Amino acid sequence: MRLSVVALLALCSALNAGDVPGLVKEKPASGPCVQVDGQYMVPYTVTIPGTDVKFEMIPVPGGEFLMGSPDSEPGHQPTEGPQIRVKTRPFWMQKTEISWADYKPYMALYNVFKKFETENIRPVTDEKMIDAITAPTELYEPTFTFEFGESPDLPAVSMTLYAARQYTKWISIVSGQQYRVPTEAEWEYAARAGSDSAYSNGDDPAKLGEMAWFADNSQGKGPRKVTAGKPNAFGLIDMHGNVAEWVQDELSEDGYAKLKDKAAAGPLSVFDVMGKPAVHYPRVVKGGSWQSTAEECRSAARLGSNYALWKDTDPNLPKSPWWMTDEPCRGIGFRVLRSIDELPRDQIETFWNVDSEDLKLDVDGRILGGRGGYGIVDQDLPEAIRKFKSGEK
């Protein structure tokens, strides 16, 4: 039976009272776990429906932390202050960055959706648009994107924030669990893993190489396998370096100044910090990459996206909403997060869909020009793809 976004949200709510991936009633004898609401969050494995691709989700405890960096921290930038106290509920975060193995099934949907459109299979009507996504068109210059390889265990890179968000909508609906990109506060909390230092393993940049793959040790060789690094105290790999990671927040020139008065009354929620992003760019990218200096890999470091530069050599008009063509794009990826508390429909859609007028114009322009398209996502999609490829009716 087809599962829509509405049904997904209802299912997720119902499952919270029963058998849910990553939640158990008894405390495990070993391994990481987080007690919450009389149950225990534990690691679990996601298998992308219709594939044999798997990735692991790790429970992260809730808590409070000081977000941003003090003026005295080497590498501090004005947009990292003033520091504010933030609280977060527990969540699961992907253990590694999204790999090409994880991302390519989503990339493959572009040709699937175009063929479905030609054959009038699973047509996208107005009433079904709530369940629709776009899939990334084929790469303009794959030799550039894949210069350092496209091995399944290398991190997927050069996708836009919009593409990352559409990926999370797809995997949420086909899997029956609600995934999204992290807020910046959630990401930084997970990266710090209980630390208040510049890096999760201290303040000394000379020791960063123990955990991170960045300019000093990558030597321009490109990213490493997503499982190659040493986990932080929460069990997450490469929160510093390898590839920088998209988060949902926009970047303001005054940093967290607009939140200072509100934060004086007590810790802010991660959604208070995020606000309501409404600009196409700059959006925040966190963690630094194999191209970055140690200071650019700090937990508090913030990189603002600049699509005017990062898509400079894209010859298309409008430029691709799904891919970037210029550095530092080969050092940018993402990882997914799942909240312990499912978000209501109107809120989760802000994490999944178009959220700025400029982006809407780009997406609409590409689709009207025949260089993009929509497809319906539900739990029947993997079987529909299988039947189509095998010639079954």
List the predicted regions and their residue ranges.
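Primarily auto-inhibitory N-terminal propeptides
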Residues: 18-46
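Surface-exposed recognition segments
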Residues: 18-19, 78-84, 195, 243-378, ...
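Well-ordered beta-strand positions in beta-sheet-rich domains
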Residues: 57, 64, 83-85, 90
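Bacterial N-terminal signal peptides
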Residues: 4-14
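Active-site microenvironments of metalloenzymes and redox enzymes
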Residues: 18-25, 69-75, 87-201, 249-253, ...
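Mature N-terminal segment immediately following signal peptide/propeptide cleavage
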Residues: 50-67
